[in-house]
A protein has these predicted regions:
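Catalytic core of membrane glycerolipid acyltransferases/transacylases, capturing the structured
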Residues: 432-434, 462-521
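Helix-loop boundary and gating motifs at the non-cytosolic
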Residues: 6-70, 177, 236-287
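Helix-loop junctions on the cytosolic side of multi-pass membrane transporters
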Residues: 140, 144, 191-223, 304, ...
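C-terminal transmembrane bundle of multi-pass solute transporters/carriers
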Residues: 57-64, 71, 75, 82, ...
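Non-catalytic C-terminal accessory region of glycerolipid acyltransferases
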Residues: 434-437, 441, 524-642
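Cytoplasmic helix-loop-helix junction between adjacent transmembrane helices
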Residues: 123-164
């Protein structure tokens, strides 16, 4: 076992018991809590709802904050690979604290220079410069503090807490602005609380300690020498790795859409919700609430959700809900429906955000991770900068009148991204679109509901005739195999009564399953099995033919699997399944939660049976050898889990 693997085993199973992760998690949440406090105050200082172009003001502020991510993203990524990520984040927090704390003096001074609306944009640009260094350092540090199988949950937890902070920040920021307008407090309290949040974040980050259990001490870390060569390597890595490039492009589309939706919220709030600053914070907070909810759902599902399925659902839902928001604005459908639309946009946006981070963290080596995140930040933030720049830089009169058109184009852009993602995920896939999509759903079911965990690699070859033989424990066994053998469709031998059922039969015919009448098998079953193997298919079979409760003796293997193996010469791959809960009805077993363990083995050696084609005992003996190989896998699984 490698040093990195041994270190990973020492990390806690529960993320909340990992002190380093909890400190990073809490620091990000607290800093997010202060983010919109200053933004709402600056928006009011620039004129806010009293202007007919509130969309332009919001877009300009968003543009100024994210522009440094585009300009400095690759450099910040190089910095995260070259210098301490922890101290980079602490320094970024303390500098942003200084910037926010000085706003009561700097904003009036900038207005005195006759900078117009840029007087509220420049302080945000200054804060964005150091946020651009904070982001790749944080994202690159996460995998060094946790196990690989915790990436989805960790990123979802970080996203959820960050968006909860954003919800409270937007609501509190708007409420404080309303109080300041009423004369109860001074507007400067928005800036002071924002500065305080960065101080608290820095204190928490300072508590992160690199001990023996931290993977960052044991994973070889190549120091990125120089500046320009490492920067070029970051771009080259993204260009060479198609999966990383694709997910960054999808993140780019999401952030362009997010920039437009965030920019139009003040106009929507004024026209539909009455024009209060607290309303603006609350309804903008609904997007953040949706992001938090989506992240919480991903935390619950964890790695069970296949990335392609998650991305497709996020793009489809995002596009449709943006159009629904457009319809709410045009048809005056009211506050409740509009709020639901904003919330659901956030829910589906979480799917994109978390998947972007997880894929980069999972596939990119630690020594290059910061630079790749820098490229990702540059690309995704370029999208939001371009989108908001087109709205905020030109002085478009009565821009708010064009909000329905902006939302319509945004929804169409997300659906076009959906079509692109579908084409890329389907590229080179030998299965029909229906089979592929159902397979993704089966993988989600097996991973989440059955809590399946595969021990070792799947040994089923990608091509050629194969008999996949497994012990039979429950009605979910076929779905468990389909969920863990992700590169081949397994065609199972199934009972005729299930094959003839309306919905189940349709699914079985798609997978080319072979029906058999248990009372009267007939020759058609054998002929269809031989034909499938002759065509190079993968035949799934349960040698025992049935399953029984755990307290009853395990059935012995029947001769059918041995006869097929000897007659066709197909490779036989053993598979052992454990951890299912017994139910007499296969239908009932689908709704019971399991904790399944699956192990695939090496091909079964049946060379001892060559030349015994006429021996009537050979099929039964071969079946016994196959069943023995399956049981041996069970002993290996029990030993490793002990």
């Amino acid at each position: 076992m490698s040093t990195a693997s041994r270190s990973e085993l020492r990390l806690p199973n529960l993320l909340i018991r990992n002190p380093n992760f909890v400190l990073l998690w809490a620091a990000y949440g607290i800093s997010a809590l202060g983010d919109h406090l200053s933004e709402m105050a600056l928006f009011q200082t620039a004129g806010g709802f009293d202007r007919p172009d509130s969309t332009r003001v919001q877009a300009l502020m968003t543009f100024c904050f994210f522009l440094p991510f585009v300009v400095l993203g690759p450099l910040a990524g190089w910095w995260a690979d070259r210098f301490s990520r922890k101290w980079t984040m602490i320094a970024a927090d303390l500098i942003r604290c200084t910037i926010m704390g000085s706003l009561p003096f700097s904003v009036p001074w900038l207005f005195g220079l006759r900078l117009g609306d840029f007087a509220v944009g420049l302080p945000l640009a200054a804060a964005g410069m150091f946020a651009a260094f904070f982001s790749p350092a944080r994202q690159a540090m996460v995998p060094t503090l946790i196990r690989d199988d915790q990436l989805v949950r960790a990123n979802a937890m970080i996203s959820a807490l960050g968006t909860i902070g954003a919800i409270l920040s937007a609501v509190i920021g708007g409420y404080l602005v309303d109080l300041s307008k009423a004369g109860y407090i001074h507007l400067d309290w928005n800036y002071r609380l924002d500065a305080l949040s960065f101080v608290l974040s820095a204190v928490l980050l300072a508590g992160i300690v690199r001990r023996g259990g931290s993977r960052s001490r044991v994973v070889p870390h190549e120091i990125a020498a120089g500046v320009w060569t490492p920067l070029r390597e970051g771009f080259a890595y993204v260009r060479r790795h198609r999966r990383v490039l694709q997910i960054i492009l999808l993140g780019t589309v999401f952030w362009a859409a997010a920039g437009i939706v965030i920019s139009v919220i003040p106009g929507i709030v004024r026209d539909i919700f009455g024009g209060q600053y607290s309303d603006a914070g609350m309804y903008r907070g609904l997007i953040a609430a949706g992001l938090a909810t989506g992240a919480a759902l991903l935390t619950l599902v964890g790695p069970a959700l296949p990335t392609p399925l998650g991305v497709l659902i996020a793009l489809l839902g995002g596009g449709l809900w943006v159009w629904a928001l457009d319809a709410a604005l045009l048809l005056k459908l009211g506050r409740l429906f509009s709020g639901v639309c904003l919330f659901m946009i956030g829910v589906h946006g979480a799917g994109i955000l978390v998947n972007v981070m997880v894929i980069i963290q999972h596939f990119v080596p630690d020594a290059r991770r910061g630079r790749v995140f820098g490229v990702s930040d540059m690309s995704t933030m370029a999208a939001i900068v371009i989108a908001t720049g087109l709205l905020g830089l030109p002085d478009i009169k009565h821009l708010d009148h064009y909000i329905p058109w902006l939302l319509g184009v945004t929804g169409a852009g997300l659906l076009l991204a959906l079509a692109f993602a579908w084409r890329e995920y389907r590229r080179g896939n030998p299965f029909s679109a229906t089979v592929w999509l159902i397979w993704q759903i089966v993988r989600l079911y097996a991973g989440f509901w059955c809590r399946v965990r595969r021990s070792g690699a799947c040994t089923v070859p990608r091509t050629g005739p194969v008999i996949l033989a497994a012990n039979h424990t429950s009605g979910v066994d076929p779905l468990v195999i389909l969920g863990t053998c992700t590169h081949r469709v397994v065609s199972f031998i199934v009972e005729r009564q299930y094959y003839d059922a309306p919905l189940a039969g349709w699914f079985m015919r798609l997978a080319r399953c072979i029906p058999v009448d248990r009372e009267n098998p007939g020759r058609s079953f054998l002929a269809n099995s031989l034909r499938l193997l002759k065509e190079g298919g993968c035949l799934g079979i349960f040698p025992q033919g049935t399953y029984v409760p755990a307290d009853e003796p395990e059935p012995e293997a029947k001769s059918g699997v041995g006869a097929l193996a000897l007659r066709t010469g197909a490779m036989v791959i053993p598979c052992h399944i454990s951890g299912t809960r017994y139910a007499y009805s296969p239908f009932v077993s689908l709704f019971r939660r399991h904790r399944v363990r699956v192990r695939y083995g090496k091909p079964v050696d049946l060379s001892a049976f060559r030349g015994r084609a006429r021996d009537k005992d050979a099929p039964q003996e071969a079946s016994g050898a196959i069943m023995a190989a399956i049981r041996a896998l069970g002993m290996e699984t029990d030993g490793r889990d002990a």
